[in-house]
């Protein structure tokens, strides 16, 4: 019997940070939890209060669900430098929470393109396509919010990259084939 590995995926955001937790056991994968951390709308972007909310809530998620591994979506460089800086602060807050709870992150990060490629098979996939594939891959009865689905997609990407495609043989609900590590 294979050991269960619990993975936390985080999609950092200045207003909403999404998270998703999955378990990988041998050839099976299971949904554990997901959600969105919303920072106070009445606070200016980006204040210590917003950072504190992200750190506190990610810390609570880690304390409750006890993941063994974590991965974070990498911040992209935006046309607007202020937006990039705010996303970087949200990412830093999430990483600080993980490190403060002694979670071995190894700073595993994936670009949005890598996440979409791993989950949907197309790096330019729309958010709705990511949500749809997360529902299919995890056998969910409902559709998670977009940011929570992104967190789950980050966790799935980490599982695919680090626990092998063999762990995800049942990910193929539509008869797609895996070629060069991608669904075709």
From Swiss-Prot:
CC per GO annotation: cytoplasm; Holliday junction resolvase complex
PROSITE patterns: RUVC
Main location: cytoplasm
Cofactor note text: Binds 2 Mg(2+) ion per subunit.
Reaction(s) this enzyme catalyzes, per UniProt: Endonucleolytic cleavage at a junction such as a reciprocal single-stranded crossover between two homologous DNA duplexes (Holliday junction)
GO-annotated biological processes: DNA recombination; DNA repair
Cofactors: Mg(2+)
Gene3D superfamilies: Ribonuclease H-like superfamily/Ribonuclease H (3.30.420.10)
A GO term, aspect molecular function: magnesium ion binding
Subcellular locations according to the entry: Cytoplasm
Keywords linked to the UniProt accession: Cytoplasm, DNA damage, DNA recombination, DNA repair, DNA-binding, Endonuclease, Hydrolase, Magnesium, Metal-binding, Nuclease
Alphabetized InterPro entries for the sequence: RNaseH-like_sf, RNaseH_sf, X-over_junc_endoDNase_Mg_BS, X-over_junc_endoDNase_RuvC
E.C. code: 3.1.21.10
Annotated residues for binding of Mg(2+) 2: 73
Pfam families recorded: RuvC
Subunit note: Homodimer which binds Holliday junction (HJ) DNA. The HJ becomes 2-fold symmetrical on binding to RuvC with unstacked arms; it has a different conformation from HJ DNA in complex with RuvA. In the full resolvosome a probable DNA-RuvA(4)-RuvB(12)-RuvC(2) complex forms which resolves the HJ.
Family: Belongs to the RuvC family.
Functional description taken from the UniProt entry: The RuvA-RuvB-RuvC complex processes Holliday junction (HJ) DNA during genetic recombination and DNA repair. Endonuclease that resolves HJ intermediates. Cleaves cruciform DNA by making single-stranded nicks across the HJ at symmetrical positions within the homologous arms, yielding a 5'-phosphate and a 3'-hydroxyl group; requires a central core of homology in the junction. The consensus cleavage sequence is 5'-(A/T)TT(C/G)-3'. Cleavage occurs on the 3'-side of the TT dinucleotide at the point of strand exchange.
Protein's UniProt name: Crossover junction endodeoxyribonuclease RuvC
UniProt source species: Neisseria gonorrhoeae (strain ATCC 700825 / FA 1090)
Gene: ruvC
